[in-house]
Amino acid sequence: NALRKIVNTDEGTARFADVQNYEIGGKTGTADQPEGGKYSEAKINTFSSVFPTSNPQFVFVVMLDTPKKSKDYYYKYRHRKGGWKGTLYNTAGWTSAEVAGKVIDKIGPILATKYIQVD
């Protein structure tokens, strides 16, 4: 399932939405907001999720308008001149996907959507 792979693989953009014992699938979206005829650094981040992916019962969408950057989401990379640089993330995979995962973790037991993973 392509939507599940976005959440539960290292290559996926929504790993923060993965909740143990739940089959969550989804799609992230990050849009730059326009300002004065060009794009600003402000973003609108969305994560649309469905669960459980093996038998979809629920859809949950999180949309964040201008999410704050967090020091917890800091990507370090080696600069071409040899030193280390970093970027604070505030894209959907780091913000709205995490919110969705936390909410689904809390409401999942109420909705009785736990599943047993079969390999």
Question: What does each model-identified segment do?
Answer:
Residues 1-112:
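Active-site beta-strand/loop architecture of penicillin-binding DD-peptidases
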